[in-house]
UniProtKB/Swiss-Prot annotation:
Signal peptide: none annotated. NCBIfam families: PRK05473.1. InterPro entries: IreB. This is UPF0297 protein SUB1776. Belongs to the UPF0297 family.
Amino acid sequence: MGFTDETVRFKLDDGDKKEISETLTAVYHSLEEKGYNPINQIVGYVLSGDPAYVPRYNDARNQIRKYERDEIVEELVRYYLQGNGIDVK
């Protein structure tokens, strides 16, 4: 499978955005409760795809695995940009 030189479009449904945000919040709290550094663990999962970065505690592992990692990254980028005053469409 090769790469193309043309730009590919990616679109996430608005309903999924809210659910991803809620899931990340719940996973963050579960990681925190277990004594992990939530940011490091979530980054580890997103970069590697290895669900072992997220514990089964409070069903956090199953919750985060409902979404593709690229969907999670899109939501994180959108949230960051909006928080910095950029009107993201």
